[in-house]
Design a protein with these regions (language model features):
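Active-site loop segments of alpha/beta catalytic cores
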Residues: 1-124
Length: 124
């Protein structure tokens, strides 16, 4: 918290990667000033994060990398559509995978399906 506040005092916003599950601790993020930066969640329920943090904090994540690696393009499309219907209203959401890089064995058609679904459903 002290580091984030120090950066913010200098006009620098932060992006914090919350590794693991933080569902039980989301309220502690509300101790930071509104608009402090971006909370990138790995395994935290992104819908719960949006419900708790609302317009206080921009949230990021929500797409399990396992879906991109082993799902089908149809499953990816449906997942993204439903996720965005739930968390897009009000803004403050960046859709991305729960980890930054897809493994080498990720099917290219699944990466395309993710990009296409974002184009189709993700515009504000």
């Amino acid at each position: 918290k002290e580091i984030i506040l120090g950066f913010l005092k200098e006009g620098i916003k932060s992006m914090v990667f919350f590794e693991g599950r933080h569902d039980a601790h989301l309220e502690t993020i509300l101790e930071l000033p509104r608009g402090w930066g971006i909370a990138y969640f790995e395994k935290t329920d992104i819908r719960k994060a949006k419900e708790v943090l609302k317009d206080h904090t921009c949230i990021m994540g929500g797409v399990p990398i396992s879906l991109i690696v082993s799902g089908t393009p149809e499953k990816i499309d449906t997942y993204v559509k439903e996720l965005l219907e739930d968390v897009k209203p009000g803004g403050g959401y960046i859709l991305t995978t729960s980890v930054g890089i897809a493994p080498r064995e990720t099917p290219l058609e699944n990466i395309r399906a993710l990009a296409n679904a974002v184009e189709k459903y993700g515009k504000y």
